[in-house]
Regions:
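Conserved helicase motor core of SF1/SF2 NTP-dependent helicases
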Residues: 1-340
């Protein structure tokens, strides 16, 4: 049971052994080796999922509560102590060498069109020059609410770019389609000679050699469940992962660089039990406030784009008075305590 792959707003409690197996006698077997995801991707996914290298005084937004789990999943202490409230440095063994030096590629774009054009050209290069199979590529769109319109826009750019390219084929076969896996097509995830395009909720439990994570700006960098989405998406990859920001608003690039500069080791101060409780509480309140902020920002952008006057009444209609008050209080606290963010 993986706490960091919980994708809903409310985390379910980790079930006990008795809740799963009853009173039957059983033996614990720790699976310390990960044969799917390379060390570089897995450690970076943990760092991003927990917020370990965020550039703030209190970076942690999520944490594995049972400290014994770290050793169970293959990490070992190389410095400090693995206990609540202490400094610790965790490393893990490289099970097999990665064939490329940079398996995590982050890119920012000014808009989604540039993002989709980049993905199209990367896929073209991978299939034509690297002999990658189309069905070894997985596209995960973190903007799950807009997957229908996003996938249509991507397919239009993809097919328009490649329609005149008579050399674009895969082992003698033409690339058949972009296979959108959503509510209308929930089961046919992997089709021969097709690229799957899906949400993180459909991608969970699946894997691919190469994973493109689109629209990572659609999730909050503060919210623990959002970072769980990013962690889960990254760990679908067996070889190479692309993390793409469609409007240049995230700071994941700096966090990824810190992991690499630290030789893919996790180095942080483990939260105290009291801090762990506060992290859980803050996570729930942030979800409500951040959703209100997202709604307000979208309303503002829409008004500006259409040259309309943005009035307070519009915000009240979109978010509700209670959420406006909470949003203002939240922003005031951030202004008063900048060193905590």
């Amino acid at each position: 049971y993986d706490e960091m792959q919980t994708l809903g707003d409310n985390k379910a409690p980790v079930p006990t052994k008795n809740e799963i197996f009853g009173n039957r006698e059983c033996e614990d077997i720790d699976l310390k080796r990960c044969y799917r995801t390379p060390k570089e991707i897995l450690v970076t996914a943990h760092a991003l999922g927990l917020g370990i290298y965020r550039d703030v005084r209190k970076p942690i937004v999520n944490m594995i509560e049972d400290i014994k789990v770290w050793e169970s999943i293959g990490y070992e202490v190389v410095d400090g102590e693995l206990k609540y409230g202490s400094y610790v440095k965790l490393d893990r063994k490289q099970i097999y060498p990665n064939l490329i030096s940079d398996p995590i590629r982050f890119q920012k774009f000014a808009n989604s069109t540039q993002q989709y054009e980049y993905v199209t050209n990367e896929i073209k290069q991978l299939i034509e020059n690297e002999e990658v199979l189309a069905d070894d590529i997985l596209i995960i769109d973190l903007d799950d609410k807009n997957i229908k319109s996003n996938s249509m826009k991507f397919k239009e750019i993809f097919y328009t770019t490649l329609e005149d390219n008579t050399n674009f084929f895969n082992n003698g076969q033409w690339l058949k389609t972009i296979n959108v896996v959503d509510k209308g097509n929930p089961k046919l995830f992997k089709l021969e000679n097709s690229i799957a395009y899906t949400t993180i909720y459909r991608a969970k439990g699946n894997e691919a050699n190469i994973v493109f994570i689109l629209n990572c700006d659609a999730i909050s960098s503060l919210e623990s469940t959002s970072r769980n989405c990013l962690f889960t998406a990254m760990t679908r990859s067996k070889f190479l992962v692309y993390i793409l920001d469609s409007n240049g608003t995230t700071n994941y690039e700096e966090e990824i660089k810190k992991v690499k500069d630290n030789n893919y080791v996790l180095e942080f101060n483990y939260p105290t039990k009291g801090e762990l409780k506060k992290i859980r509480t803050n996570s729930k309140s942030e979800i409500t406030v951040i959703k209100s902020m997202d709604t307000a920002i979208k309303s503002f952008r829409n008004a500006v784009e259409h040259n309309k006057k943005l009035e307070l009444e519009l915000l009240l209609q979109q978010t509700g008075k209670d959420n406006i008050d909470e949003l203002l209080q939240y922003l005031k606290e951030m202004k008063d305590k900048p060193d905590e963010w």
